[in-house]
Amino acid sequence: MSPVAPPPAPPRLSLQTAAIAPDTTALRSLDWDRSRFDIEFGLRNGTTYNAFLIRGQRTALIDTSHAKFRESWLPQLQSLIDPRAIDHLVVSHTEPDHSGLVADLLELNPDLEVVGSKVAINYLEHQVHRPFRSRAVKSGDSLDLGCADGGTSDHRLEFVSAPNLHWPDTIFSYDHGSGVLYSCDAFGLHYCSDEVFDSDPGAIAPDFRF
């Protein structure tokens, strides 16, 4: 009788939060063992899904995470903020690693306003299967979050339509208060690391083509 092979080890998934700008926290979902992305990309160093929490007088969350992080990502978000205190969810595009937990977030905060391109809002209506408040934006539109109590940065998100970089519903968000451009996937690559910033270009060079 042939020996029974042991079950495969569960994938390594971890979370990291880091302050990256005034009143701004990155929520990083680290998918260490992912070996393929969008079928055609073979990955050597996993990948990372990023969301960003911006607190002014009003609060915005840019993107969520992949559904595989549901059990850990939502509690991590709740450790940072009561989801009912989030006013706006900006969806950069509806690829599953950006929008995989939108429905879960709407369960926690049904009054949340979802902000995205007209195409993204249409896609989400078919993904979450429930009514939700929404705002369709295009290049030149903006969302004023104001200045956090005790803060010095007046956060205003200006949107840039970027269809087919690399999905048809993509938008960029530029925060005039912090000077941060949230560029969706336009300048990203698949590389999983504990380092929040790519301070060593040599480390990521072999993966840059992905």
What are the roles of these predicted feature ranges?
Residues 3, 37-42, 65-68, 90-93, ...:
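Short, flexible loop segments at the rims of nucleotide/cofactor-binding pockets, characterized by
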Residues 1-11, 15-22, 177-178, 196-210:
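Accessory terminal helices/loops
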Residues 3, 8, 12, 19-22, 151-210, ...:
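Metallo-beta-lactamase
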Residues 57, 68-115:
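Active-site metal-binding motif and surrounding structural segment of the metallo-beta-lactamase
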Residues 17-79, 172-175, 180-183:
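Conserved beta-strand hairpin/beta-sheet module of binuclear metal-dependent hydrolase folds
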Residues 62-64, 85-94, 114-117, 161-162, ...:
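Active-site neighborhood of phospho(di)ester-bond hydrolases with catalytic His/Asp-centered motifs
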Residues 104, 126-129, 192-196:
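Short acidic, glycine/serine/threonine-rich loops at helix termini
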